[in-house]
Amino acid sequence: MKKIIALFTTLLLMGWSLDAAAFTCKVNDTGQTMTSGSANVYVNLTPSVGVGQNLVVDLSSSVSCKNDSSGGSIIDYINLTSGSAFGGALAAFTGSVYWAGNTYPLPMNGNSSVYTITHTDYRGLPLRMYLTATGAAGGVVINSGELIAQLNMHKVASDGNPNNFIWNIYANNNVVVPTGGCDVSARDVTVTLPDYPSSMAVPVTVHCAQNQNLGYYLSGTTVDAANSIFSNTASSSAAQGIGVQMTRYGSVVPANNTVALGTVGTSPVNLGLTATYARTSGQVTAGNVQSIIGVTFVYQ
């Protein structure tokens, strides 16, 4: 009789233990499962500009969770908690997190609303992160493997059993996250000029999340009084007496002079720039020519 009682006691304890751990999350990319604790989540960033905010990452396809109770009889209540914030190169930025139909400021100073989970299959968390747009068409470089955010999550079930999760979000690719209300087609453009005295169009466009009156100006080291010829910075076998000049529809564009683009919306607008050689002082000698020219966008 004592053996039978001991067997029943073991079965009852096992049953209680299974009910208590009635919630599991999974990192979809690695397959790692967990009932509490922290995990590193590597995501491919494909940011895009929006009205007043720019999407950084949609985590709904990266982290999935499910209810482990029989038929979802025990209800799991999930919410994000204080301390969730951007990290790494994005740490200085503010933004927002979308969670289950509501949006909260980042960094979070309080807890979010509760998301109820009764489904017993893995489903993505309704979770997206945004940067607050500042300026025109700026951006911040994110390197592969760099931490971009930490999200804190709390779970409690209808029968108790609270647990905490920490999602450390890392970039899985090199990308420039737009920080302004507009974005450009490329942020590092190499224009290869044919032999002197040729020219080449600069393939750069800009678009905005909503109509903006936009302009831009060029910057770099110039060698003439008009600030229109950019210096040759070639490090080896540099040509002499030659620099690079930028024109727009046939007119020279000096450095630090704002060029008005007019209204720019969701359709890309070409900057209309062409790179060409320009004579400086002294005798022209053959060699390499290289100039580094910045483009800064401004609202007008």
Where do the model's predicted regions map?
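N-terminal signal peptide c-region/cleavage motif recognized by signal peptidases
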Residues: 15-19
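Sec-dependent N-terminal signal peptides
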Residues: 4-14
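Mature extracellular/passenger domains of Gram-negative fimbrial/pilin and adhesin proteins
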Residues: 21-300
